[in-house]
A protein has these predicted regions:
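An acidic, glycine-/histidine-flanked metal-binding catalytic module
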Residues: 1-92, 108-141, 157, 214-385
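Short cationic amphipathic helices and targeting signals
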Residues: 202-211, 324
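Extended, gly/pro-poor, charged amphipathic helical "stalk/hinge" elements that serve as dimerization
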Residues: 154, 158, 201-202, 206
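Charged, alpha-helix-enriched surfaces in structured cytosolic catalytic cores
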Residues: 149, 153, 195, 203, ...
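Short, flexible, solvent-exposed loop/turn segments with mixed acidic/basic and small polar residues
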Residues: 190-201, 279-281, 313-315
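Surface-exposed, low-hydrophobicity interaction/linker segments
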Residues: 92-125, 129-194
């Protein structure tokens, strides 16, 4: 595999003058920024949609079909709940046109324009964002479906999207996905300082390898346009050692005009915190990694109409935490050498788990195995899981 990836990486296709750059909008760039920097849209002071087409694409990523009456009715209900919360609980006074007159769908455009209405639209949309997320979590608890069924629905959705992305010109040279096995999940929790199952975000993981570093940005654009709601990226959980988005934008005259708005967003909505590098990764391991709550429609999964009583209060969309890893071919090869390798990662993780579990045995007078038996072998050599 690695020889093939290296050959692909040396082809040099998809350079900075790729004609696809003309398709990038400021909405795309700000969404990509949120993916790779793990920000929270609650800190944003505006949106960046230019027209109804961009808005409708964003809604479809959230599993809202602008052509379906029940979906737009659900959007209106969320707006009504948001305004009620803001005025009743927080004492806000939302302008009538934002609270009622403007279609809820168009609030995304209003929040992208200048003027007083933008602030009101942003406030309402932020609460709608939270309400929809909470509703999706509540709906999961009411469903008579297994986690396996929902995971399978996510896998099918991502697989379809990746095929579409390839058809759109994305040079994805390798794609794989996995679910964390029970033993791996237990090991991860025992190794983590905060060993809470809710904090394990990679139960479902998708990994893509592109032919070049620049191609990663094109892949990210397609993801935010087709699959990943940038507003449901988990804040503070993104890691990016590869993509220099500002540099990517600055190198191209077509994109350079968007740089001031990107820098303004960086000032207003700074990163939530410095990402914590995985302590078990090798010293030069590089990756673009983020976690998002992916929306999945369950009315179709259950073969029920959107107006079914089951969906009356919480809609028909649930969310599934999903991890994405994206690297270019050359980096993928470097990540498998020496200390960066997956085998090395697992060795360090296993050693930590065994050391934590055996901690205190000596103080209690118990006989401690050689080297705390950290290796799983009696001769002290490192063993692989």
């Amino acid at each position: 595999m690695l020889d093939g990836l290296e050959a692909v990486a040396q082809k040099g296709e998809g350079g900075p003058h790729d004609g696809r750059l003309a398709l990038f909008s400021i909405a795309d760039l700000t969404a990509i920024r949120n993916l790779i920097r793990g920000g929270s849209v609650i800190d944003w002071h505006r949106l960046y949609f230019a027209d109804r087409d961009q808005v409708d694409r964003f809604l479809r990523v959230h599993e809202f079909d602008p052509e379906r009456g029940p979906d737009m009715a659900r959007l209106e209900a969320l707006r009504e709940q948001a305004v009620d919360y803001l005025e009743r609980h927080l004492g806000f006074h939302i302008a009538e046109e934002v609270a009622e007159r403007i279609p809820a769908r168009d609030l995304l455009l209003v929040a992208s324009q200048n003027g007083k209405r933008r602030t009101h639209a942003c406030v309402v949309l932020k609460v709608m964002h939270v309400l929809q997320h909470l509703a999706g979590r509540e709906l999961v608890n009411r469903l008579s479906v297994s986690a396996d069924q929902i995971f399978r629905a996510v896998e099918d959705k991502v697989l379809r999207t990746v095929e579409e992305m390839k058809g759109a010109g994305c040079a994805i040279v390798e794609f794989e996905w996995s679910r964390k096995e029970p033993d791996s999940l237990i090991t991860k929790l025992l190794a983590k300082r905060d060993n809470i199952a809710a904090h394990v975000y990679d139960k479902l993981r998708f990994r893509m390898i592109t032919h070049s570093e620049d191609e990663i940005v094109f892949v990210l654009r397609e993801l935010v346009q087709r699959l990943v709601p940038f507003n449901y990226v988990i804040p503070g959980e993104s890691l990016n050692d590869i993509v220099d988005l500002d540099g990517f934008v600055e190198r191209d005259p077509t994109l350079r005009r968007h740089l001031p708005q990107l820098l303004d967003l960086s000032t207003v909505a700074a990163d939530k915190r410095t990402p914590v590098v995985n302590e078990f990764s090798g010293p030069s391991y590089r990756v673009v990694n983020f976690v998002a709550d992916l929306p999945v429609r369950v009315d179709q999964l259950l073969n029920r109409p959107p107006g079914d009583d089951l969906f009356m209060d919480n809609g028909s969309v649930v969310f599934v935490l999903t991890e994405f890893q994206i690297v270019d071919a050359r980096t993928a090869e470097a990540n498998e050498i020496g200390e960066n390798s997956h085998e090395g990662y697992k060795e360090r993780q296993i050693m930590r788990v065994k050391a934590r579990l055996a901690h205190g045995m000596k103080d209690e007078g118990e006989r401690t195995p050689p080297l705390l038996d950290l290796t799983g072998r009696q001769d002290g050599d490192l063993g692989h899981d």
